[in-house]
Amino acid sequence: MSVDAATVRRIAHLARIAVTEDEVPHLQGELNAMLAFVEQLSEVNVEGVEPMTSVTPMQMKKRADVVNDGEIADQVVANAPSTEDHFFLVPKVVE
């Protein structure tokens, strides 16, 4: 797969990045190099390799699913500048 100049401009537009015409050829080369590397990865033989989330074996840390006392509303809003009935009061932003 190859990226042309029009595709570079479109990607820049979608990403809301200002790209000058002088930068397009350089970015085109960079994107093509990245795609070539990804294509090389598809040639790697992964037969017999189990799917993994990390290169180092580790167990997911899980906590017990227990109900905690949630009656700490006073502590939650203690540092808020303005509250009412355990709710944060904020300035109105939509008219």
From Swiss-Prot:
Heterotrimer of A, B and C subunits. Keywords: ATP-binding, Ligase, Nucleotide-binding, Protein biosynthesis. The keyword Membrane does not apply. The keyword ATP-binding applies. GO terms for molecular function: asparaginyl-tRNA synthase (glutamine-hydrolyzing) activity; ATP binding; glutaminyl-tRNA synthase (glutamine-hydrolyzing) activity. Gene3D superfamilies: Glu-tRNAGln amidotransferase C subunit, N-terminal domain. One of its GO terms (biological process) is regulation of translational fidelity. Pfam families: GatC. Allows the formation of correctly charged Asn-tRNA(Asn) or Gln-tRNA(Gln) through the transamidation of misacylated Asp-tRNA(Asn) or Glu-tRNA(Gln) in organisms which lack either or both of asparaginyl-tRNA or glutaminyl-tRNA synthetases. The reaction takes place in the presence of glutamine and ATP through an activated phospho-Asp-tRNA(Asn) or phospho-Glu-tRNA(Gln). The lineage of its organism: Bacteria, Pseudomonadati, Pseudomonadota, Alphaproteobacteria, Hyphomicrobiales. It catalyses: L-glutamyl-tRNA(Gln) + L-glutamine + ATP + H2O = L-glutaminyl-tRNA(Gln) + L-glutamate + ADP + phosphate + H(+); L-aspartyl-tRNA(Asn) + L-glutamine + ATP + H2O = L-asparaginyl-tRNA(Asn) + L-glutamate + ADP + phosphate + 2 H(+). This is Aspartyl/glutamyl-tRNA(Asn/Gln) amidotransferase subunit C. Its EC number is 6.3.5.-.
